[in-house]
Amino acid sequence: MSIKLFSLAKELNVGVGSLAGFLRKKGFDVEDNNPNVRIENEEFDLLLTEFGKSLPKGEAERIRKKFVKQKQGTPASAPSAKEETAGMAAKEAQVIATEVPQDMRPRFTIKGKVETEKPAEPVPSPKDKEPDTVREDKPARETAPVKEETKVVPVKEDKPKEEKPKQEEPKREEPKPEEPVQAAPVAKPVEKPVDKPQQPVMTQKPQEAETPPPAQEMEKKEDTEEVFRLKTNTQEPQVKVVGKIDLSSINSSTRPKKKTKEDRQREQNDADGKKKRKRINKAAVDVKKEAAKVSGEQGKRNAGGGNHPSGNKNNNRPAQQQSNASGGRKNNKRQSLPPKVEISDEDVQRQVKETLARLTTKKTSTTLGRGAKYRKDKRDAASRAAQDAMELNSEEQHTLKLTEFVTVSDLSNMMDVPVNEVIATCMSIGMMVGINQRLDAETINIVAEEFGFKTEFVSADLVEAIAPEEDNEEDLVARPPIVTVMGHVDHGKTSLLDRIRNTNVIEGEAGGITQHIGAYGLKLPSGRRITFLDTPGHEAFTAMRARGAKITDIAIIIVAADDDVMPQTVEAINHASAAGVPMVFAINKIDKPAANPERIKEQLANMNYLVEDWGGKYQSQEISAKKGINITELLEKVLLEADILELKANPNRRAIGSIIESSLDKGRGYVSTVMVQNGTLNMGDVVLAGTCHGRIKAMFNERNQRVKQAGPSEPVLILGLNGAPAAGDTFNVLETEQEAREIANRREQLQREQGLRTHKILTLEDISRRRAIGNFQELNLIVKGDVDGSVEALSDSLIRLSTEEIQVNVIHKAVGQISESDVVLAAASSAIIIGFQVRPSVAARKQAETDGVEIRTYSIIYDTIEDIKSAMEGMLSPEIREEVTGSLEVLQTFKISKVGTIAGCMVKEGKVKRTSKVRLIRDGIVIHTGELGSLKRFKDDAKEVVAGLECGLNLAHSNDIQDGDIIEAFDEIEIKKTL
């Protein structure tokens, strides 16, 4: 038994890492970060025994049975079915093998006699040659051989011994399809040797009677084919094949009696010519006797129209072919059956059934019958093809054709599974993902398999199109480490970088929070270089942090000493550990009076991250980024981690790296921030990144200074791409621009196909669900931003705001200024345009005013999310709540013409307003709900009546008021719904 560790972890409700760690303690070699690793019986028993203790009673046994059933149930059943079919085939083969030799022996011995006796007889040799010449001419002359095939139908009944072996050997029927036609030519050679003496021929024919059978046998084969086709419809039981073998054995036993009848026929031929003709037809074995053929032709001439009725009665082929003699022969054969009855009653019944079966097939084997059979076969083939197509479609429905790095939302749409379930599955295997985060192939396989889908990646050829270059050991040189600063928002990530770089980046960020992923190169006083990546800490920038962890070598996790380990900090730690990146913990803000670094270390220890001060393996440093305390010590620890990793790269090769950010600059075009991971990037190189390509026109470092080349671990800003590649894409340097263009075009085509696959069409189920909800709303948004990472993060956050009643759709997202095309799209789809740190052009603003399209611009992601939330709350239908204001008792009723029933009431509690809605209650049952028609105190109209006072009133649209009824007054209050 071999099962995936991930499947067992899910059943035991234990993390994969815990199971792997336990197995390693027991001496098994198990990978820690691979949930797909398979375990055997011994490991399975150990895990179930150890972790099954905490399960409810009987749960461990249920899990054991489940996996044993999964692994043993299906494989065992399939082979057994094959073995049974093989066994049945073997049994049938054995039954046939016992009976076939008995049928084959007389046939082969007789054919051998024919060949030995032919050279001895000079007379039959010319006879044999003449039919041969006629046979060669005949097929060329005759255009309708079918008529002559059927003439020999009676012969099949007289010689059933040869039918059955032929059916057992269907391969012999195919090589000689034209020989049945040769049976008819026998009629012409008969005319030439008519004058020859018949008696010597008759004496020799019993032995030579087997020379013509090859032609007759082939005719019989076609007839037997018809019988065989009839039985092909019921071939499944395979019992009828055995029955045919038995019949052949019976017929072989009747064969010698036919020879004795020939002797009798010779005696009767001299006495009576009529009987002679009939019995010659009866002994169809001797059809090729020249004398018998002459008599057969005479019978045809004499029997002319008299035998037509018999042919019609039989409804067989001879009726169509003017073969009157054949009809007569069949009648004679039926009369000749009684002497055969002497053998056995059972044999007779079998033979009669076979004959009737042949006759019924003959009725349907007319020209019309053949057409019907052809149409039926065609219908059967069409139905089988349709069934196969349905099975293929069902398989295709459970096969996902996708490109690698599909987003979570696209994957959920293709599987028709809620996004939350996909995210929960990813979290169960230790991956923190967002809605718009792209997954790699291995993760997609795991998630799809969990929901019962198979995956087929259609972009594998494009990945292989760029062949990786191998580096020689002697070419590798040390490279600077890439360090990512990660942590919760406002915990001091950017302040630390400011202190290290002696700049002030925070002032340039809107709202004082980092909204872009920044890359900075730094040269230390010791001469060593470090590349820093600053990631956003806000919860919306999950994908950015994941990208930062993917391309980094070392992660600095910053935690504020006066705060706790916050959710984004935990998420950053998970990203770094999932990527296998070593971490250094920096406890910031120790200069504050409320700082408590020991509490932070305790919280980290509770998460299984022990720092070195507490006996663990993770380095930590207490710092103050604002005052510059212990910054040098922190950098030394980072360099120590880098020395342990032995980071190397080959600068003498074409560059490869990752896209950190991309944006659209009005003066410079599309600008991309890239991190070179290996090789050297030069001016003029042809770069391919995702679906974008181009030749580098200019390169700038993080201080906006021009550079001509960038080595490993250097971040640079490049100009020249024809679009804004997605953040996180890998870029490659290719030899020619044509090659880059071809690959980019194919990738773009695949991306469009992927978009069509993930486009979800509104189904009846969705419509019924919306009808059930009632007031279903859709909010369409177009998101434009300054950089790709911010657009992705904002779109992710906005889509997450969707509820059951309001669905948020980001119909378009892009980098750059808000243009006229965005306004046109928004007008067509009733969408709102969200601009994040971008402004609309003059033409776009005028177009928006004309079309009535709303454009909202923001600089801080918090404000954007809050505004969209409030807009969605305004779209929600308000919640209506009833508030009872008072109750009245009807003391007496008065009926007034043209007015209706007036009720004199006493207000028991609360007060009754003229505008209040009322409910009439009788014996605790609501009789009527409506509004007041009038409310009076004495003769004056009253706006309200308080408790303890009497009043008169009548109900609008109702006069059914009785003494003793209770009237309840209430107001409906609309309460604004919140998300």
UniProtKB/Swiss-Prot annotation:
Molecular function GO labels: GTP binding; GTPase activity; translation initiation factor activity
tr-type G domain residues: 478-646
PANTHER family for this protein: TR-TYPE G DOMAIN-CONTAINING PROTEIN (PTHR43381:SF5), TRANSLATION INITIATION FACTOR IF-2-RELATED (PTHR43381)
Annotated segments matching region G1: 487-494
Listed Polar residues bias regions: 309-326
Binding, GTP: 487-494, 534-538, 588-591
Main location per the UniProt record: cytoplasm
Record has Nucleotide-binding as a keyword: yes
Function summary: One of the essential components for the initiation of protein synthesis. Protects formylmethionyl-tRNA from spontaneous hydrolysis and promotes its binding to the 30S ribosomal subunits. Also involved in the hydrolysis of GTP during the formation of the 70S ribosomal complex.
Record's protein name: Translation initiation factor IF-2
A GO CC term assigned to this protein in UniProt: cytoplasm
Record family assignment: Belongs to the TRAFAC class translation factor GTPase superfamily. Classic translation factor GTPase family. IF-2 subfamily.
